């Protein structure tokens, strides 16, 4: 890797332990499987804004696509309508089941699911190269070299540029309902997408980046309908019901024609590059 004025690799390593600590270290399949339903619901709320990310990607009907850490298929399913085929890879069987359900509901027939831990992926051995590789909000973002080795045409990586993230949007609805959930400090731009951008630059890559509006939205005919829908995201004990409703009320606005709207907006970056020999 080119020796730049700043050691971005060291900064990246220092920024990583907090994100990697926790139960995912011992059993990532169990951890991600347990939240498959929640992520599926959040993906539904994000559908309107997901289109902004899709519009930023260069994908043609001739391309094979690998979606790493696909979750419930938030990107995999709509990408399948743009591409020749999609391989949706995840560590949790429950996530892949949701992905398959969503693909079937959308009439998608060119999507294949693959159960595999990213740490066990060996490019060219147990996972073949694809034209396009997508890694969105996944631990795979920590290994740009491996991502580069899996793609023929483009690698696309996506993550948040500012607060609130998906976790923050979710958790805000359940503060006081689940005592383990606490507000997080706002994201620090000092350690944002600039880290991966500069890592790639120091490896001889000329990355592209586009920041798009992201968010979560749904309109409801009543507040009661909103409560009933959003409670799918997390268990609500009977004695915490009023706390939950007050949390939801903070995020609802009345619609002129009746009903209410839930909307939380944020931003996501889409970064991409043409794979090739890296300067390591």
Model regions and ranges:
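Conserved class I S-adenosyl-L-methionine
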Residues: 1-58, 156-180
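Conserved beta-strand/loop positions that form the S-adenosyl-L-methionine
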Residues: 68
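Conserved SAM/SAH-binding loop
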Residues: 72
